[in-house]
A protein has these predicted regions:
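Hydrophobic transmembrane alpha-helical segments in integral membrane proteins
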Residues: 20-30, 40, 49-70, 172-175
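Aromatic-anchored segments of alpha-helical transmembrane domains
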Residues: 33-37, 102-107, 158-168
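Juxtamembrane boundary at the C-terminal end of a transmembrane helix
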Residues: 44, 163-175
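Structural signature of hydrophobic alpha-helical transmembrane segments
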Residues: 62-67, 120-132
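Membrane-helix exit/interface motif
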Residues: 75-82, 106-118, 137-141
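Membrane-interface helix-boundary motifs at transmembrane edges
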Residues: 82-92, 143-150
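Hydrophobic alpha-helical membrane segments
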Residues: 101-104, 124-138
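Membrane-helix boundary connector in multi-pass membrane proteins
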Residues: 114-122, 136-154, 170
Length: 175
């Protein structure tokens, strides 16, 4: 009888080991949220109902993103400035999950734009790009940093993310 570990392809085993528990939790939560959103969109019968649903999701993700950015900034300050520690694997995996949700936020905004919706101010779209692109830049800086600890990259990254999200919220359509 063959055991599961020997019959599993090598790339899956390496992926499972690399993701770790926090990576799987992040991947599962992102997949569940995206699945819920797609099912909810399919249930809606008219495009106006779909647009209203997307507007609600976009609004909720922006507020959730701001809260998560503030919490991650506090954690980054604690790890980097108070404990003088370096980036941990779980912190990086959570950051990847946050990036995935910010990317989803951008996709939702783009779909709303294609459906005819417009932001309160035109710069909202530029700030939306800033939200999506800010974390990958600071992740790149941290991953390629030769000097350790490199937690300062995430302190700057989550500060910028929170600030850009605040600006996005203020330039979006009126509530």
């Amino acid at each position: 009888m063959t055991d599961v570990a020997s019959s599993t392809p090598g790339w899956i085993t390496r992926l499972m080991a690399r993701l770790g528990t926090t990576g799987w939790i992040g991947l599962a939560s992102f997949t569940a949220f995206t699945g819920w959103m797609l099912i909810a969109l399919l249930v809606r019968s008219t495009s106006s109902e779909r647009y209203i649903f997307l507007t609600d999701v976009h609004w909720l993700l922006s507020r959730f993103g701001l809260a998560v950015a503030a919490v991650m900034l506090a954690v980054a300050v604690y790890i980097g400035l108070i404990r003088h520690g370096d980036v941990t694997a779980w912190f990086r995996r959570i950051t990847y999950t946050i990036f995935a949700f910010m990317l989803l936020q951008g996709v939702v905004g783009g779909v709303m734009y294609l459906m005819g919706g417009r932001a309160g101010e035109d710069v909202h779209i530029i700030y939306g790009y800033g939200v999506v692109l800010s974390l990958p830049f600071f992740i790149f800086v941290e991953v390629t940093a030769k000097k350790r600890p490199a937690m300062g990259s995430y302190i700057w990254g989550f500060t910028m993310l929170a600030a850009i999200i605040v600006r996005c919220i203020t330039t979006g359509p009126p509530a």
